[in-house]
Structure formats: structure tokens, C-alpha cells
Amino acid sequence: MAERLNVLFLCTGNSARSILAEALLNRLGEGRFRAWSAGSMPRGEVNPHAFPLTRALGFSDEEFRSKPWDEFAVAGAPRLDFVITVCDNAAGEVCPIWPGQPISAHWGIPDPAAATGTEAEIAVAFREAARQLRNRIDLLLALPMAKLDRMSLQRGVRDIGETADGASE
């Protein structure tokens, strides 16, 4: 595997979960990873409730945009090592053929953008999604990448998505 690993997080709308995952891995990966996000049917704008969480990680709002996954399946796109879906709809869709045959996995997270209620209740839903994503990203970061063959790494990344909320036991 390359020294710096490239990860694409996918979601249908690319407005909340995948954006949060991109921000978290770019911050927590400390240069070992480069993350992006995209959607099969991007909403065209990031959900405003995601911004307080990305700002808390030290990012500006302008660093994120809702974009189609096709941008990553064309010549000149970054070579992807991992493609991870974070919503059930994207997991069931036919994805583009990614150059380089990246390792794929599904880490289902409830959609905070579907939360209703007061601003405080919606903020709680976004924080909970970010917590679950962070738990899974922490597990990804703990994998001994250099010591695992491709099949073991595939299994390890997929197993992360099968933990109840990403918490290690």
C-alpha cells in the first residue's frame, strides 16, 4: 500500500455523513490518510448542521462541497485505496468502476439530516453520527496496514462496519 492512503466516503446526498467522515479522517489521520467524500445523487450543498462539527475540527466551511462520485472515476482522479459507503442507499447502488480496485466496505450510520425536532435535537443527531464515525475511523487508524495482506485488510475494514456503533469491545 502507498505511504499515504486515499479514502473516498460515499453517501447518496453527500451533505452530512460522508462530509463528516471526510473531515474526521483528514484530521485524525495525521497525514497518513487523505479523505474525500461524494454522493450518487449529491444535494449540491452541505447540510448546515454539519459545519459546527467540521469547524470544531479546524476546517472552514469552504473546504467542503457536495459533489458527484463520478469525479473520482475519471482519468486524473486521485487513486483510491478505500471506498467506504456510510449510508444504506449508497451501499445498494451500482457504483462506478473505481480505477485501481480499491478496498470497499459499508459502514452504515443513521442519517442525521433526517432528524426532526428542535435545533438542539438536530444537533444531537449530528453529534451522534460524528461519534459513530469517529469510533469507526479510530478502528481504521488502528489497523496495522503495513502488516496485513489485501484480503485481511478488506476483512478488517468491513468488520469495522459490522460493529454495532463502531465502538471497540
Go through each PLM region and give its residues.
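Short polar/charged helix/loop
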Residues: 2-169
